[in-house]
């Protein structure tokens, strides 16, 4: 099947009001698990990797794996760069032919710098036919190279409107109470804020920090306008549990068990997001 773009997948989700899962990967087993799940569910899906995950393998190793797997898939698959902080990594994704990239400017000290950099990257991406995701506010929970963890800052609906107008970003990641990684307490999502953001902008909204949310949280956020749902930690935890289930088995068998567990965890999310049966 031809390679799809995230813009194509989210446009359909926007029109039909469902969510498309994005799953971060950093090796072949993860890529295979996600695509197996998507094919099993007859669901569109987005795969990709994040700049912070490149410590587990070089971009030039994982990028061709994702792209080739997407082309061979029996369902629509888009390939996306998640949380690109540096110009160099974003340019690598563009060079490899990713259909979309995320620029995360939330670590910029000045909001104006985030706006300026996002607008510049939007012009570059659009000239190449690539979609750009940006984040406004801060979901929090990610650590930088020095180990400092980002703190959460909610997205302001008025700021969201002006940000999209000034930058031309195609997708907006919003902060409404989620956080990356494992939650230490039950998250409290600000659904009223989400509704206000959804009314303020006309681009697909993205939910980061999806792992650990309840089924109702997912249903409510998708009903409130979320069209792309990012998942990573839940998939990793499924693989970890599978590997630890039998410490005596061979390494290769443990990898297969982990892949099956990730596939099942992914399939659960695809059905929950409402994308199953839409391929």
Feature map (PLM): residue ranges:
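Alpha/beta enzyme core
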Residues: 4-16, 27-53, 60-76, 84-200, ...
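Glycine-rich beta-strand-to-loop/alpha-helix junction loops that act as flexible
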Residues: 208-211
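Extended, intrinsically disordered, low-complexity segments
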Residues: 243-279
């Amino acid at each position: 099947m031809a390679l799809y773009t995230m813009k194509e997948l989210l446009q359909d989700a926007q029109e039909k009001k469902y969510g498309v899962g994005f799953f971060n990967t950093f090796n072949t087993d993860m890529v295979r698990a996600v695509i197996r799940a998507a094919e099993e569910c007859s669901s569109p899906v987005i795969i990709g990797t994040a700049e912070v995950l490149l410590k587990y393998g070089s971009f030039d190793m994982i990028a061709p794996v994702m792209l080739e797997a997407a082309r061979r898939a029996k369902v629509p698959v888009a390939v996306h760069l998640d949380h690109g902080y540096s110009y160099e990594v974003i340019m690598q994704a563009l060079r490899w032919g990713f259909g979309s990239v995320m620029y995360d400017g939330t670590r910029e000290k000045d909001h104006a710098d985030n706006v300026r950099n996002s607008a510049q990257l939007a012009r570059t991406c659009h000239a190449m036919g690539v979609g750009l995701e940006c984040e406004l506010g801060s979901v929090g929970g990610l650590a930088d190279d020095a180990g400092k963890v980002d703190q959460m800052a909610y997205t302001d609906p008025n700021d969201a409107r002006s940000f999209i107008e000034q930058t031309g970003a195609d997708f907006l990641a919003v902060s409404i109470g989620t956080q990356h990684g494992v939650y230490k307490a039950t998250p409290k999502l600000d659904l009223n804020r989400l509704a206000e953001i959804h009314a303020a902008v006309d681009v697909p909204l993205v939910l980061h920090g999806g792992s650990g949310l309840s089924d109702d949280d997912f249903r409510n956020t998708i009903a409130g306008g979320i069209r792309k749902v990012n998942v990573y930690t839940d998939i990793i935890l499924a693989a970890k549990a599978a590997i630890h289930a039998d410490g005596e088995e061979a390494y290769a068998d443990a990898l297969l068990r982990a892949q099956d567990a990730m596939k099942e965890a992914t399939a659960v999310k695809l059905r929950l997001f409402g994308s199953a049966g839409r391929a």
